[in-house]
A protein has these predicted regions:
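Generic, well-ordered alpha-helical scaffold segments in large soluble proteins
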Residues: 30, 34, 76, 107-111, ...
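N-terminal-proximal low-complexity accessory segments that begin disordered
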Residues: 1-36
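Glycine- and acidic
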Residues: 12-17, 86-96
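Conserved small/polar residues in nucleotide/adenosyl-binding loops
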Residues: 194-201
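Conserved oxyanion/phosphate-binding beta-strand-loop segments in alpha/beta enzyme cores
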Residues: 31-88
Length: 201
């Protein structure tokens, strides 16, 4: 596996010249490419953990740690005059949960991946599940937290399901997140379903 510096140089870039935002998106690609060839855990018994929310938090540091390269990447950034904590600050907070049960669900799927248990989390892909508070004209207002960007940890799939209602049908599509266990050769998935806005009269 190439180092992050080699990965950056292969794209004809110099780590010292990049902004924290540019470094973050390159690290995102670097980690996803490292995780992509890992096979899905396919042991005979399988656990499905279904939850309305998964409070997974930011994923960059956790994925670097689980791949066993956090210290190496941190040192490479420091050698280039960059701070990994400042790069981590660029990452948007996934709006997939905001409570203790969501945190518990995330801990379970992380633990299953690290213990080598074949398991998948199943939940909803909230595009604006959290909100941020801002002040306008000396008044506090809530704004949606748009966390899904063109480049994100989400891996799109071709899987979809029709969900019929009385007067209309929604198509639910499936995206997933790779859940990496600590220094494991296999991975699990967090499967997230979403739809387009429902039709209104």
């Amino acid at each position: 596996m190439a180092t992050f510096t080699q990965y950056v140089e292969a794209k004809n870039k110099n780590l010292k010249d990049l902004s924290n935002e540019e470094i973050y998106y390159l690290l995102l690609e670097f980690v996803k490419e490292a995780a992509a060839p890992k096979p899905k855990n396919d042991s005979k018994r399988k656990v499905y953990y279904i939850s309305a929310e998964f409070l997974i938090g930011k994923l960059l540091s956790n994925n670097l740690i689980n791949l066993g390269i956090y210290k190496d990447v941190k040192a490479e950034l420091a050698a280039a005059g960059k701070s990994i904590s400042e790069v981590e600050d660029v990452e948007p907070e996934p709006s997939l949960g905001n409570g203790g049960l969501g945190r518990l669900a995330s801990c379970f799927i992380d633990s299953m991946a690290t213990l080598g248990i074949n398991g998948e989390g199943v939940g909803l892909n909230y595009h604006c599940g959290l909100f941020k508070q801002v002040f306008k004209d000396n008044k506090q207002e809530a704004e949606p937290n748009y966390w899904i960007e063109d480049q994100s940890w989400l891996v799109p799939t071709d899987i979809s399901y029709d969900v019929p209602f009385k007067n209309f049908t929604l198509k639910s599509r499936l995206d997933r997140l790779d859940i990496l266990g600590y220094k494991k050769e296999t991975k699990n998935y967090l499967c997230l379903l979403y739809t387009s806005p429902s039709p209104r009269d």
